[in-house]
Amino acid sequence: MDKIIKTKKLESYEETIYKIFEFTNLYYTDVIFLDCKTPREVFEIVKNLNYKPDPKGIEFLSRPLYSIFEKDLPRDCDDKTLIITCYAKLKGIPYKIAVTGKNKYPHHVFPILCLNNSWVIFDATYEYSEMGKFIFAPVFFKIFEEKDLLKFNQ
């Protein structure tokens, strides 16, 4: 199994979102061991993974298997989002990715899953995160679906 970790300067939040969608399609089987878990159980598992921010000015995005099992790697909102989007893809659960910010600038990502015909906030970034709730009142808020990011494929 390849250990793929993207490390680069931040270009844009759209590029980060694109990479989450790309890695979801490439590595969703990394979370096959979660197949028997309910969405709520997966939320709790991901929430309880220690948060570790990326180094300043560098964006790390690790494949889920490494985010889950290697404690020395950065594990921030985009890494936790990727674990959950991989689970959603594995289970056939529709998902989107939200980008938020406490002011007019984006700085946080999290998944939104369609459960029982309702879109549910699935932000498991921090230990105090609660399924279905924002971790802060966003000023900046934008939702992406994979089809929104086709320009990065050209």
Region annotations inferred by a language model:
Residues 1-154:
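A structural boundary/capping signal
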